[in-house]
Amino acid sequence: GVGLARMEFVINHLVKVHPMALVAPEKVTSEDARRAIAELTHGYAEPTDYFVDTLALGIAKLAAPFHPQPVIVRLSDFKTNEYAHLLGGEAFEPDEENPMIGWRGASRYYSPGYKAGFALECRALRRVREEIGFENVIIMVPFCRT
């Protein structure tokens, strides 16, 4: 199996777009980012479908060779400065003095500024497990705190 596959690597290398830039594209101010996002999402009915499909296929490629052994996939755990480097990301990320302890991990998922982005991650994981059939994918929640 796989002890830890980091979802943010799949997002960074394959998806390349901040999920909130697909949820709220009108907030992306950079023309270059808008153009690049339009190219990546061309052919999709909704820009968010690009995120879900690309992320699901990337995770499925990780899970396939190890099936039926467990593949632990950690939900995204970008720090704000890392998320800002994704296409369209600057519009959605605050400047933090110390991103290592800032808005990341589990606390990001339920916050109003990322809840819709987290829903896209969940849709991708559901597709991998229920539609593609890789039930060997096990979800890990990062950076839980009280």
Label each region the model flagged.
Residues G1-T146:
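Conserved alpha/beta-domain cores
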